[in-house]
A protein has these predicted regions:
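An aromatic- and glycine-enriched ligand-binding surface/loop that stacks and positions planar moieties
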Residues: 81, 87-201
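Aromatic-anchored glycine-rich loop motif in surface-exposed flexible loops
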Residues: 1-78, 94-99, 109
Length: 201
């Protein structure tokens, strides 16, 4: 149907827009590829990041209209709120602050997502923990009770073939446990989790 076609297309637009968000913030101007490649291509040229942002905004506005809400899709699929959230980030890049406020307010007031206030999940009876602790347990992340999840990566804890990917709350640095792998220019260990450890350059 036209509805399912647009939902699928909107999900693909989200994935592309997410990748271009990361690329343009890391590298600036990059090649913009909008058509399927069927043979090798080597004559790429860059497109200004501002032009890319405008294209991604247009795509995400389409996606935000056509991708279903989280309660209407299977876990792991792109959701309407995820599209709106990424669209808000693009609006901020463009200085369109009122549009960013409008679209994030739609998520907040949309009735699907709300802040978790009640304990839930596999260890909700552990007395010295709270709802934040519950939300970041590996086995709780994709439960329906976790109403704060806009887009979930499904990685079933304890099942064959799973990875530790959903254990990570936020990556801000290279993994400090790789002692001896990351080196400073003079060859010293470049990462440490020791308290007050100074790393000489």
């Amino acid at each position: 149907s036209e509805e399912s076609k647009n939902a699928l297309l909107g999900g693909a637009y989200f994935i592309r827009a997410y990748r271009y968000y990361m690329k343009t913030l890391q590298y600036g101007d990059v090649p913009l590829v909008l058509d399927e490649l069927t043979e090798p291509k080597v004559d790429y040229y860059t497109t200004t990041k501002e032009s890319i942002w405008l294209k991604m905004i247009k795509d995400l506005e389409f996606a935000a209209q056509h991708v279903p809400e989280a309660n209407k899709v299977k876990g792991g699929q792109v959701t309407k709120a995820a599209c709106k959230h990424l669209l808000a980030k693009y609006y901020l890049l463009e200085g369109r602050f009122d549009d960013a406020i409008r679209i994030t307010t739609e998520i907040i007031n949309g009735g699907v997502h709300k802040l978790c206030t009640e304990r839930f999940g596999s260890n909700k009876s552990v007395a010295d923990k709270d709802v934040i602790w519950d939300m970041f347990r590996i086995e709780n992340k994709s439960l329906p009770e976790n109403t704060e999840g806009l887009l979930l990566t499904i990685d079933r804890y304890g099942m064959e073939g799973n990875t530790s990917g959903t254990q990570v709350m936020y990556n801000a640095l290279p993994y400090y446990g790789l002692t001896g792998v990351i080196k400073t220019p003079n060859g010293a260990n470049g990462m440490s989790d020791a308290a007050k450890n100074e790393i000489g350059i």
